[in-house]
Amino acid sequence: MTALIETIEQASIKLKANVYFDGKVVSHTITTREGERKTVGVIYPGTYKFNTDAPERMDILGGACRVRQAGEKDWKPYGPGTTFRVLGKSAFEITVDTGLVEYLCTFEEQ
């Protein structure tokens, strides 16, 4: 388990939301002063599949979810303070049973 991220200092934020799955997944893009691209958002109950271009690190900030990586059979649980990574040019499914999941996604270099 990692420490919960609470603040990102000196970053630019795109005000236009990234809206997926009819508004069930909503995020905003952040660029840090070091040039690192991230999204911060919420996921409502449901199961969603995402394809990745670049490798991603997902930090779960709040709520509970289960994740299944491309090519895997088993779902793994994640909660606040946990992290999972997804390869570039891959995919993952995420399920939220109840409540909201708050997350921070960091796009990592390939």
Question: What are these model-derived regions, one by one?
Answer:
Residues 31-53, 83-88:
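Conserved short histidine dyad/triad with adjacent acidic residue
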Residues 72-89:
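Short acidic-glycine-tyrosine-enriched beta hairpin
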Residues 87-110:
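Ligand-binding loop in jelly-roll beta-barrel domains
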Residues 52-67:
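Short, conserved beta-strand element in jelly-roll/cupin
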Residues 4, 22, 27, 40-44, ...:
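Acidic, Ser/Thr/Pro
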Residues 1-36:
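A short, N-terminal "cap"/entry segment at the start of jelly-roll beta-barrel domains
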Residues 50, 67, 103-105:
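Short hydrophobic/aromatic-rich beta-strand segments that constitute the beta-sheet cores
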